[in-house]
Amino acid sequence: MGKLAVISDLHVDINHFSATDLQLIAELLDANQATHLHLAGDIANKETAAMTVIDFFQRQLPTTFHWGNHEMADLSESLIETYPDPAFLNFQTVALSEKTLLLGVNCWYDYGYSDLQSTEEILRLKHLFWYDRMIQRTGTDPEISHQINERLRQTLRGLPQDKEVIVTTHFVPKATFIVKQTGKYVRWNHLNAFLGSPEFGAVIDEADNVRQVVFGHTHRRFEDQVIGQTIYSCRPLGYYYEWQLTRRFVLENQLTENFQPTKLRGLLRTNQAAFNQYKAAHLRAELQQAITWINY
């Protein structure tokens, strides 16, 4: 028996993670008796920073990874899909045990979660607001996504049917995990176009031996959901100003009446020393909530 730990959306650069913070994660993995770590994308914005993190954890325990959209902005298309590292799992598997395989897939999005009908408007928003405007890829987003989903179908069909498969990906595979905003925030629903692909989830539905799917990207944490016969787990770490510990810090110190994560960075800088002290006391608990643990 072993225990898989999956972490998505570490964002070590945006979150200003130090060597001490990474060591805290390593200690948490050890305390929970993790025997394999998989990093499910958005480790860092830059390839070198991401690989430094991967190297750190590989010195602690077996560690694999695939990319999220943030690393992709620093990579050519060939390196996005086929990165020359044996720990890179994009349409590759690693045997966790005699009966359990871990399959990693970067994934992509096809606008299937958007409330907009106009592809032109979706692309306008992408180029105006979305980080992925910096990613250079061949083909349209729906074309790329469909190719990936078809490759997933063929990959799953080619795996031994007597093995249980744990799939890790970065993007959202099921509409259950898409939050629909209302009121003055309803316009944010337009950006759901870039969160994932419902077709990816439909391909998973075809496979009888996929035990669990783990993903992130949405920066929202959910309770595990069983859809069909598969467990879906989404608990990304996300940005520091989105964390639960940050929410508690702001509200406990009465720094604002309304918790709006995207407007907190200046407020936190003004109270940096106090926030750093609070974070040091509560980061371990935040990390514990943002790791998916799977016994195998």
Spell out what each predicted region is.
Residues 75-92:
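Glycine/small-residue-rich loop that forms an oxyanion/phosphate-binding "nest" at active or ligand-binding sites
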Residues 12-15, 44-49, 69-77, 94-95, ...:
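Active-site environment of divalent metal-dependent phosphoester hydrolases
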